[in-house]
C-alpha cells in the first residue's frame, strides 16, 4: 500500500489527517466516515421515531449549521421519515446575534427547511442580553442567557407542536462539562451531562445530541470542505471563565493523546450514582408563574426576571437556601 494514498480507500490522495484517529484520508472518505458515524449513533441510541417532528437548534455557528446539513442529508439518505424544523433564538446581542441570524436565514433557504425565530425581548418583558449585561455586567451573564435560552427553545418548539429538539453539542463540549462537574465535585450531574438524550417528566421537550461523539475539529473540517455557510465570530460577551479553563485543559490533553476526549466521555458514562445521592436530587415540577419546568415553586427564569425588573441583581443566583427564601416572597402570578 502506498503511503501517498488514502488509508481507507487506497485510491485517492489524502486531503487531511483525521483528528479522531490520525489517519491520512481523502475528502470523500472523510465525508463518509463522519456522516456514517453520526448515523450509527442515531440508530444505536434509537434517537428518533418515524413521523416525528424534530426541531434543530440553529444559531448560525459551525456546530448547528453542520447539524442542520447532516440531519437533512441523513433523513433523506436513510429515510428516517422526520419532519425537520430550524428553531433559532434572538438573544438581542447587537453586532453578533443579528448577523448570525442572517446566516440562519440563508441556511433556511439553502436547506429548504421551515424555520421559527423567537426573541428574548418578546418573551421576557422586553429584556435582551444587551439590556441584561448593561444592568448586571458580564460576571453572571452566561447564567441568565443559558436559563432564558433553554426556555425560549421550549416555547418555540411547543408553538410548532415539536417535542424533540436536537442540538449541536459535540464531544468536546460534553468532555468539558464532565470535567467541570468533576472539578466541582458535582457528581450528581454526571449522568445528565453524559446522556445523549435528556428529558424530565415535566419537561415539554426532550433534547438529543447526535454529535455526542463527534470531535469539534472534525465538524470544522466538514464545514470547510463542504463549503457550508456559517457564522464564525465568538459571542460578544466572553464565555464563562471556568468552562474556558476546562476547554483549555481538554485541548492540551487532546494534543498529547487525541483519544482523550472520548476517554473522558466514556469515563463519565461509566460512573454510577449511589442511590443516596440520587435521592438528594430535587424533584422537578412546573413553575407556578410561567408553567415551565422547575425544581422549585418559581422557575429560575422567572426568578431572574423578577430580579431584573426590581433592580435586584443576583436574585436567583445564590445558594438553594437563599433562593428558596426569596421564592417564598414572590407571588405566583406576575403583578
UniProtKB/Swiss-Prot annotation:
It is found in: Cytoplasm. It comes from the Eukaryota. One of its GO terms (molecular function) is ATP binding. Keywords: Cytoplasm, RNA-binding, Transferase, tRNA processing, tRNA-binding. Its EC number is 2.7.7.-. Disulfide bonds: none annotated. CDD domains: CTU1-like (cd01713). InterPro entries: CTU1-like_ATP-bd, CTU1_C, Ncs6/Tuc1/Ctu1, Rossmann-like_a/b/a_fold, TilS/TtcA_N, tRNA_thiolation_TtcA_Ctu1, UPF0021_CS. Pathway: tRNA modification; 5-methoxycarbonylmethyl-2-thiouridine-tRNA biosynthesis. One of its GO terms (biological process) is tRNA wobble position uridine thiolation. Interacts with ctu2. NCBIfam families: TIGR00269 family protein (TIGR00269). Belongs to the TtcA family. CTU1/NCS6/ATPBD3 subfamily. This is Cytoplasmic tRNA 2-thiolation protein 1. It comes from Schizosaccharomyces pombe (strain 972 / ATCC 24843) (Fission yeast). The gene is ncs6.
